[in-house]
């Protein structure tokens, strides 16, 4: 939360963590030490839109048309690695950038994948949530790798397109969100419907799937 009247103030977030853990995020760490991270954010709304996943380092990076992409994975039993899903993610996100053309809402984008261990008490709410510079995804670790890759292609492509709407094109209720007295937008049909339409259209347009599929 935030103190009343301070929502528009800059924030400095300091996180102390074990050396073996690394924070995957689209934010820039201003501290070079191995057990301390420092992030500076311009206002509270930006702070809550930048998730950070701490785990043993397992990530890849690549660049698509000037945008740095980070793929970070937490797999408790190490059944899946970032390297094992990166080729499909790179192909899909390259196709999306080709489809979007010059639209470039961020210079860095992070995909944070948390795989849940179904044999232990762990995350059960599977799905994904978009942010202006990242997507967080929670899926079961037990999924066969090919099925996981296929689901990730659909899920991440949908969430990535949210950088267009509602993260760039949106109503004033979204732009100036009141956390204490939220007013829901009437444009969910556009935010989700248009996004899902283009998440499928670009795959056809870029030859990733056929129109029949």
What are these regions (language model features)?
Residues 1-4, 28, 166, 178-180, ...:
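Generic, ordered loop/turn and secondary-structure boundary motif
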Residues 1-106, 124-127:
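Non-catalytic architectural context of zinc metalloproteases
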Residues 9, 85, 92, 156, ...:
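Alpha-helical structural motif
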Residues 24-26, 128, 157, 193, ...:
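Small-side-chain structural scaffolding
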Residues 44, 95, 159, 194-201:
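Alpha-helical scaffold segments in carbohydrate-active enzymes
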Residues 61-187:
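Juxtacatalytic substrate-recognition/specificity segment
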Residues 169-178, 182-213:
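Acidic/His/Gly-enriched intrinsically disordered linker/tail segments
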